[in-house]
Every structure is written in structure tokens, then in C-alpha cells.
Amino acid sequence: MKKYLLLFLALNVVSFSMELTLDEAINLGKKNNRQLKEKDINVKQKKLNENAKLKNALPSVRAQTTYVDHDESKNVNSSFQNGVYLSQPIFRGGDIYYNAKSSKVLREFEEDDYISQEIELKLKIIESYITCLQLKRTLSVYEASRNEKLEELKKQTEFYKLNLIDKSEVLRIETSLYQTETSILKIKNNITSQKLILKNILGLNIDENIDLKEMEFSKFNVQNIDLKKDTEKAIKNSTLSKKLDKNILISEYNSKSNRSNFLPKIDLEYGYESLEDSSFSKSNNDWEWRVGVTFKWDIFNFGSGMDSYKESTLEIEKQKIYKIDSLETLKREIKTSYLDLITAKETILTNEKALATALETFNIDKEKFSNRIIDSVDFLKSESQLREAQITHINSQLDYFLYYQQYLSLLK
């Protein structure tokens, strides 16, 4: 009964595991990732800030009441004055205009930054997903190796009982089997750890069971890649390029806004207020409309305004230099990524040949070992070479896909 209960629980655990393809994992990450949610909030905040800056150019209305309470010994009544006022900026030297333009570009920059983080998130998910698959396939190789050694250990144990071989042959295979068991345990632990990393990226609970589906690699030919064309396109239209341009534009608007401090500020105020102070001891219903113009000009402030303006103009130059440096780095990264992709493709072809050779060698050596032509040392060496060739081939296939995704991410 206990065995059936354990089997039922095990089946439930499997049935409640979340199966994910790579595309599903990417979509889930975009939906749940906490860092991406924070960035989305930043975009909304910048939009609200843009609205606030635009509204600074609109008139504002305020109600104002002034109350004065005098000392009774002076025989003066307490008084108050009421008014409703409408204020409208007329001229601010371009401060309101450039702040509004700057806030718009800041919002667009934040949107581009959201896209950048989305691209980075997708690449992180792919890298983590690929690592899990590499470990999963590596585990299959080691489990096949363990089964091979278990089968061989049984044969050699029978041979030893028949006094056909000495005990050292059995011990070598047994030792190798223990080492394989240890490797399997390490790989399983690594898979668990890597899945924890992936679940964190996807915004899943760490106790959530996930099962990653194998990937069908689409055939893509690196010969179809036009490196020069891709690089030129990335320099002009990539998200990074757009962000760099916006940084310069923001600096220019900030500089023009600082320059407005040298110009006068003119505001129009239109009010409806009581003619004079009204007393609590008498009734006064006389109100009138009043209009006024406020003119303000900071003539001298020991050059602090000029220093701020010069600082802002230097910021423009700094951002232009930063753009040149960043785009040069981007070109170098695209070139390097392309070369990695070419190398990875050739590596796959080489590893395929190496795997075929290792497999054929192992089959020959296995036959020799069965016929006692070679000893367990040579057999285990051949088996180890086959295992390493299988793992290397697995990794090269997945690395090729990963390099291709890294190349594409640099162009976006």
C-alpha cells in the first residue's frame, strides 16, 4: 500500500510540472520578470512627468485669503482680503518649452531602455535555458555510460568467478562506475541550481516544478549574413544608437533651458479680488477685476548661472564622445560575435567527425575487450573519449544557437 501511495505522489509531482518550450519561457519571462515590471513603471512615470511639464505652459488658478488679527489695545479691527487669481506664463526664455521637449525625449529614452532590457532578458532566458538543456543532455550521456559500465561489470564479475581474469579488471570498472555515479549526482545538482536561476528570471516561485522541452534547431546559414550591412543598420537604427542620440538631445535641451536663466521672466496675472481690506465688523461686497504683469530678471548672481550653462554645454560634448565610443564598441562586439558564430559552425562539423571516430573506436575496443585482446584500462579510456566527444558535440550545437541569438541581439 505504501509503495502505491508513493507512486501516486510521484505521478502527481510529474503531472503538476510546468512544461515549457523556449518561446513559452521567453513570453513568461516578459510577463513576470520583476525588473521588467519596474522598468514599465519607469516608463509610466516619465509619461506623467512629460504631461506635467507640458501643463506648466497652461494657466493656473488659485484662491487666496489673507487674514490679519490686530492687538485689541490698538483699537484696530481684524481684517481679511479675498481674491481669485489666474496666472499665465508669457515669456520664460524658452525654459518651459525646452523642459517639455526634454521630458518627451526622456520618456522616449525610457521606452527604448525598456526595449533594451527586454532584449537582455530574452538573451538571459535563452542562455539559462540552453545551459539547462546542455546539462540535461550531458546527464543522459553519463546515465548511458553508467548503464554500459553496469552491464560490463556484470560480465567481468562472471569472468572473475570463472578465474578468466584477475580482480584488478573488475575493480577498475567498479571504480570508474563510482566516478560516473558521482558525476551524475553533480550534474543533477547543477540542473537543479540552474533551474532555480531560470525560475528567478522567469518570475516563478522557486518551488515551482518546470520541465524544459527539447529544442528543434532551425537551420540558418551564416553565409547569408551580411556583416557590413548588419553593422551599418545597427549603428543607425539599433536601440543602443537611438538611446545615444536621445542622450545628446536631452543634453542639448537642458543646455538651452539653462540658457533661459539669462533672460527675463514675464507672467500675466488676472484676478478678481476685494477692493480693500474687509473687516468682520462691517459688510463690504465691493469686488473688482484686476490685471497685472510680473517682470523678473536676474541681473547678477556672481556668475553661477553662467557656470551652470557652461557645465551643460560640456555635457553635450561628453555625450557625443560617449556615443562615438559606444558605437565603436558595438561594431567590435558585432564583429566578434560574428566570428564566434563562424567558429561555432566549423566546430560543430569538427565535433561531428570526432564523435563518429570516437564511436567507431569504442565499438572496436568494446569488441576487443570482450575477446580479451585489450584490458579494462584501454576499454575505459575509449569509453571516456566517446563520452567526452558526445558532450562536446552537444555543447557545440547549443553554443552555435546561443551565438546566433547573441549576434541578433546586438542588431536590435
Regions found by a protein language model. Name each.
Residues 79-81, 127, 172, 288-290:
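Transmembrane beta-barrel architecture of outer-membrane proteins
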Residues 153-170, 361-380:
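Alpha-helical hairpins and coiled-coil heptad-repeat segments
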Residues 37, 60-77, 87-116, 242, ...:
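Small/polar (Gly/Ser/Thr/Ala-rich) solvent-exposed segments
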Residues 16-62, 166, 206-249, 299, ...:
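Bacterial Sec-pathway N-terminal export signals of envelope proteins
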Residues 17, 118-233, 337-340, 344, ...:
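Periplasmic alpha-helical coiled-coil/stalk elements that build and connect Gram-negative outer-membrane
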Residues 4-13:
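Sec-dependent N-terminal signal peptides
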Residues 83-85, 129, 290-294, 338:
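Membrane-embedded beta-strand positions in outer-membrane beta-barrel channels/transporters
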